[in-house]
Swiss-Prot record:
Family of the protein in this entry: Belongs to the anti-sigma-factor family.
Keywords: ATP-binding, Kinase, Nucleotide-binding, Serine/threonine-protein kinase, Sporulation, Transferase
HAMAP family: Anti_sigma_F (MF_00637)
A Pfam match: HATPase_c_2
Protein name per Swiss-Prot or TrEMBL: Anti-sigma F factor
Signal peptide start and end residues: none
Any GO BP annotation: sporulation resulting in formation of a cellular spore
A GO term, aspect molecular function: protein serine/threonine kinase activity
Catalytic activity: L-seryl-[protein] + ATP = O-phospho-L-seryl-[protein] + ADP + H(+); L-threonyl-[protein] + ATP = O-phospho-L-threonyl-[protein] + ADP + H(+)
Domain of life, source organism: Bacteria
Function: Binds to sigma F and blocks its ability to form an RNA polymerase holoenzyme (E-sigma F). Phosphorylates SpoIIAA on a serine residue. This phosphorylation may enable SpoIIAA to act as an anti-anti-sigma factor that counteracts SpoIIAB and thus releases sigma F from inhibition.
Native source species: Geobacillus stearothermophilus
Transferase in keyword set: yes
Annotated gene: spoIIAB
InterPro entries: Anti-sigma-factor_SerPK, Anti-sigma_F, HATPase_C_sf
């Protein structure tokens, strides 16, 4: 069974919590544990915050797009911006790396995503934007997947 949702919103920090809760509510149909829901909310928060702060430099005119596809107990989550892009993806994925040290950002966003998800793919082009693909299987303990 396949189910999907798509969401677009202005790149405003106050929309991060809306995105987090919306995705968690959609994923709840898989009956994840409380810890698993917390993890998906954290991942959405990190990806959306990266888009707003780094992709759009806090320009509220930018648009963040989220797609979630659930198929056979697997969540496919995509977070996309059309911001400044990432010049060096490998460097950006290093723990503690940040382009905004003045904001006291921890530089752990991608590391957190990698720890909570089964797969994280980052595609980016300078001055065109960034897309983060995330995948998590909830099948192993779900009767829905049998």
């Amino acid at each position: 069974m396949r189910n999907e949702m798509h969401l677009q919103f202005s790149a405003r920090s106050e929309n991060e919590s809306f995105a987090r809760v919306t995705v968690a509510a959609f994923v709840a149909q898989l009956d994840p544990t409380t810890d698993e829901l917390t993890e998906i909310k954290t991942v959405v928060s990190e990806a959306v915050t990266n888009a707003i702060i780094h992709g759009y430099n806090n320009d509220p005119n930018g648009i963040v797009s989220i797609s979630v596809i659930i198929e056979d107990g697997v969540v496919h989550l995509t977070v996309r911006d059309e911001g400044v892009g990432i010049p060096d993806i490998e460097e950006a994925r290093q723990p503690l790396f940040t382009t905004k040290p003045e904001l006291e950002r921890s530089g752990m966003g991608f590391t957190i995503m990698e720890n909570f998800m089964d797969e994280v793919i980052v595609e980016s082009e300078v001055n065109k934007g960034t897309t983060v693909y995330l995948k998590k299987a909830y099948c192993e303990k779900q009767t829905l997947c049998n």
